[in-house]
């Protein structure tokens, strides 16, 4: 395990060939097996290829344009350039795996201390799933 952790690296140059379904399944299984706070498993995995991937990238581009023109979250402005760079990378990959938290609260909802702690724990659980997936 230490070898996998110490030799892990981010790849940002991709081959123009599809990822075999069994590889995608193994990556998803690694995420599913991650530990989660109170075993809530606060994740849904969405695999996007082809037209679905193109549509997801287009939706992100549209959202970034809207955010630049009229910020929904004004504090996000410094991060737009980074998100645009991420979008360029997303367009190059053969498959995208989105991880969403179906238990998350609305951005506009005021949270109690317990709800805030739960949100933090869910985010950490999703982080564990992502790490498992990248080590796979």
Segments (PLM) and residue ranges:
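Glycine-rich phosphate/pyrophosphate-binding beta-alpha loops
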Residues: 35-39
């Amino acid at each position: 395990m230490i070898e996998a952790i110490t030799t892990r690296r981010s790849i940002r140059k991709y081959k123009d060939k599809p990822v075999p379904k069994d590889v995608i399944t193994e990556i998803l299984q690694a995420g599913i097996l991650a530990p989660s706070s109170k075993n809530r498993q606060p994740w849904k995995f969405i695999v996007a290829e082809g037209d679905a991937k193109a549509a997801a990238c287009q939706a992100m581009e549209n959202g970034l344009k809207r955010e630049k023109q009229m910020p929904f979250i004004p504090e996000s402005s410094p991060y737009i350039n980074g998100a645009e760079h991420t979008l360029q990378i997303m367009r190059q990959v053969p498959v995208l795996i989105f991880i969403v938290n179906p238990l998350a609260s609305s951005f506009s909802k005021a949270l109690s201390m317990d709800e805030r702690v739960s949100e933090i724990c869910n985010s950490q659980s999703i982080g564990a799933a992502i790490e498992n997936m990248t080590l796979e």
